[in-house]
Amino acid sequence: MIQIQHLTIIHTKDLRELVHDLNLTIATGEKVAIIGEEGNGKSSLLALLVNPKAHLDHLSYQGTITKPDNPQVYIPQQISDSLQSLTLNDYFFADTYDLDYAILYRLADELHFDSERFASSQLISTLSGGEKLKIQLIRELARPHDFIFLDEPSNDMDLTTMTWLKDFIKH
């Protein structure tokens, strides 16, 4: 369960209040969508939910976020610069201690991503936006997780992948 109490988030650059006095409890198994216009704090709220102790230079906040230290999946809007320079081989196999390979290959098949590419030396930076999202979904969902945080998951997504994601979220 995740519990948010009296959370107010302020953007420190322009002192704009992004979230005001939010109170929310998310029960185990519950699905929540954060919907709003661009630039109004959805990603900032999500970043704090993923890591309430994170120091975010552009934000200040008051209130409490309580959540267990259970494993989680976080797929940001854009893949980080540090991951862009990795090869697919390194991305999928350099840190494998908790990967479930059966799930990894099943997800690759379901998302129409050729699993033979896992071992390639292709740089992540050369992938299309949709392929970058697919590799994140494949790898992260093949790890143990109790929470899944997706930031703008439909960006760069083709119709087939969007349909897959909707079905995944429903079940």
Model-derived regions, located:
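Conserved phosphate-binding and hydrolysis motifs of nucleotide-dependent enzymes
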Residues: G29, G36-G41, G130, D151-E152
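Short loop/turn elements that form and flank the Walker-type P-loop nucleotide-binding site
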Residues: T28, P68-N70, R143-H145, H171
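Catalytic Walker B motif of ABC-type/P-loop ATPase nucleotide-binding domains
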Residues: I148-E152, L165
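Helical segment within the ABC ATPase nucleotide-binding domain
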Residues: M162-H171
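ABC ATPase nucleotide-binding domain signature region
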Residues: K31-E37, S43-D100
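ABC-family P-loop ATPase nucleotide-binding domains
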Residues: I10-T12, N70-P71, P76-I135, R139, ...
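A short, flexible loop at the N-terminus of ABC-type nucleotide-binding domains that lies
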Residues: M1-I4, T8-L22, T28-E30, D57-S60
